Amino acid sequence: MPETIIESLDNEGRGVARHDGKAIFIEGALPQERVVFSSYRRKPNYELATAGRILAANALRVEPRCRHFGICGGCSMQHLGGPGQAAAKQRVLEDDLWHIGRMRPEVIFPAIHGPSWAYRTRARLSVRRVPKKGGVLVGFHEKRSSFIADMDSCEVLPLSVSALLPLLRSLIGALSISDRLPQIEVAVGDGVTVLVLRILQRLTPEDESLLRDFAEAQGVQFWLQPGGPETAQPFHPIEAPTLSYALPDFGLRLEFRPNEFTQVNHGINRMLLRRAMHLLQPETGERIVTEIHKREDVF
């Protein structure tokens, strides 16, 4: 297999190199690394590839924490530590500003960092019955594939949600409509977890009983979505706390529905708002008008 030296990262976290006059985009490779690569798609001007052996590693390379990394398509940069990821994304942003808008910022503030693990408060999990895998799979799609990753944990989801993955596989496998439930939307607020089940067929009374028992045992809320997003409604418990998250610096609490937009990382959102208000330095009596996407968020 050919080898090359990585020059940079693209906006999808792939290493970028030049080889035989072509741009090569290599998954799993980092800048300044010398890698052996294998191409899986060839075009006249570029190739898409995966890294094989790392002959000379970047000093910031780390061992991926998740044992599903490399197969699951939910993450692409676990082989680069958190500070390295932030620096790489900043460079991509600076390059985009220049190449698209011919802009070079006069001042760049330090990147805001948050936890690298168990931070993701939203997720769309795919569901599929796969007899060859022993039953129902619940998780993200595999890389470059319509197959669902065979996973029983996720390092970026909250620990309580990650622990639900094997339990959900068993639960859905016991439903009469297990092959008519293609998706679970996960939304996590402060102390509240909602699972929206996309169903293509009505539940039986036995199915409903199983869902109620699971919700009570695991402390989650089930919603059902028989059609488009607007059809999502609470199933059990009917009377339950609303999804929300607090902005304690400003005495605010934002409420949202599970299928409405919020930032995936609530902690980072709080820090962004704190920095924005510090930069604006509003005086007493001044009003600040913000553009709020779908009303629930501020960034």
Go through each PLM region and give its residues.
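Accessory RNA-recognition modules of RNA-modification enzymes
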Residues: 1-299
